[in-house]
Amino acid sequence: MNLLITGGAGFLGQQLIRALLARGELAVSDDGAARPITRITCFDQIEGRLDDARVRNVAGDIADPGTVSSLINAETGAVIHLAAVVSGTAEADFDLGMRVNVDGTRAMLEACRRAGSCPRVVFSSSVAVFGGDLPAVVDDAVAPTPQGSYGVQKLIGEWLVHDYTRKGFIDGRSVRIPTVVVRPGKPNGAASGFASNIIREPLAGREAVLPVPVDTRMWISSPRSAVANLLHAASSPSSAWGWNRSLNLPGLSASMGEALAALEKVGGAAARARVREAHDPAIMRLVRTWPDRFNTARAQAMGFVVDRDFEAIVRAHAADYPPA
């Protein structure tokens, strides 16, 4: 069986591909039978870095229909669509966000439709589809009302996944991933990136800026849980999803003050002292539109996992990425 991971050269994509290679098989049909993975196509704007005979690294434009069509055929058992322009960039560059997040998603879905084999598609969505006047706790019955371009673009993707599934072109499911913390590597253009920066940089001996007040809460997931939940979304049967193909994934509601306390427990007072507050009104305005508490009973009943606490997330990062 062949798999396609779009956005596969990014941090989460590379972690996901490693997990798939280690597993060696995936159940993508409703009989629950696992099929051996023979090829994983890692597609992104730059080539992926994994060196494995089962991985084909391809660079290209996700919004180019011809390029995307060349990646998907009747042998493609599943597509996990991670390719996206992140929140801060999508807000700053409307045309780029629409091109990648909407046109690129449509190009992928059309390629699946033309393949004619109804592949399983996991669409990586976001809690940014919610905003405005929300209840204190959001569940799957709350109507999405995004207040930023990124959230709007992700919601359009969800609706397309619903309709392509309804028409029998794909077996789709959209998972609203919490903010993934801690991301290794360099800071990116995500408005939520500071939640990783204030942990990763101080643990590595570098200073970091917190652009929001310490009482700002966010819905958080570790990379390990995010990867596990993407795999579970890809392997769970259609019957588990029913008519609602969008799902709020489990996470932790944590304040930035709690994040800094966890940083100090793991890295000591010196690490905590490397973080300074310098509020950014644009980031504050966008982040405050996102909900920070969810009822994810449906997802947990379906077998999706949740992290224990923020300190465990920080300790896992410190273990996986020790200072050089």
What are these regions (language model features)?
Residues 202, 213, 227-229, 233-287:
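Mid/C-terminal beta-alpha module of Rossmann-like enzyme folds, strongest
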Residues 132-134, 147-173:
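Active-site Tyr-X1-5-Lys
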Residues 162-217, 223-225:
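NAD(P)-dependent short-chain dehydrogenase/reductase
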